[in-house]
Amino acid sequence: MYQHIPIEMKLLLTYSDIDPAAWQSLVEQSSYATWFQTSEAYQFYASNPKEMIPFAYGIERDGELRAVVVGYVTKEKSALKQFFTRRAIIIGGPLIGEHATESDVEQLLRVTASELKSQAIYIETRNFNDYSKWKGTFEKCGFNYIPHLNFHIDTTSVELAQSNIGKHRWKYIRLSIRDGATMVENPTIEQVEECYDLLVELYSTK
C-alpha cells in the first residue's frame, strides 16, 4: 500500500510576481503590518528613482502568500559616494502572516540578502513591531538583532510638550504655523494622499 505524503510547494516571488489581492490580504491580517510594507510603499519608492532603488520579495507556500519584504536601496548622486554608502533599508520590518513558519521567514530573509548583496553593503530592517519571536531566525540569517528604545514625549500639557521637544525644533514648528500650517485630526484619504504627494516632491527636489 502506498501512502500519499503531501509536498509543500514554495515559490519565491519578486514584486511583479506578487498577486496584489494576496498582498493586500496579508497586510490586513498580519499583526506586523504597517503602511511601509504595502504595494503603495513600493510604488512610492519607485516614484523617486533619483533617491531610491525599490525592491520587494515574497514567499508563497501551498498557494498562500506567507511573508513579504519591501524596501529600497539608498542612491547617491556621486558614484563614489554611492559605492561606499549604499545600503538597503526595510522600514517597518518584514510583513509576516499568521501561517508563516520559521522556514518561510528564514528563506525570505536569505533570498533578500542574496539578491541585494551586489547592490548594498548591508541591510537594515527597522522593525516597528515586536519581532523578538523571530530573533533566532534573524540571527541565523546573519542579522544582528539590536533592541532600540522608542522616545516618548509627554503631551499632558502644551508647556511640557514644548519643553520636551526642544527650542530649536519648536522654532521650526512656530515658523510653520506662522506660514499657515495647521493640525488636522482624522484626515481624509485625499488629505493623506496630498501629504504623500508633497513628500514625493520634497524628495525629488532636495
Regions found by a protein language model. Name each.
Residues 2-22, 137-206:
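Acyltransferase donor/substrate-recognition loop-hinge adjacent to the catalytic core
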Residues 11-15, 28, 40-114:
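Conserved donor-binding loop and adjoining core beta-sheet/short helix segment
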Residues 27-42, 206:
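Conserved GNAT-fold acetyl-CoA-binding loop/helix
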Residues 54, 91, 120-122, 148-150, ...:
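Extracellular structured ligand-interaction cores
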Residues 58, 67-69, 121-127, 184-186:
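A structural signal for short, well-ordered beta-strand segments and their strand-loop junctions
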Residues 65, 88, 119, 144-147, ...:
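A short, structural micro-pattern
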Residues 74-76, 129-132, 158, 191:
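Short, solvent-exposed loop/turn segments at secondary-structure junctions
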Residues 103-147:
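Non-catalytic accessory segments adjacent to catalytic cores
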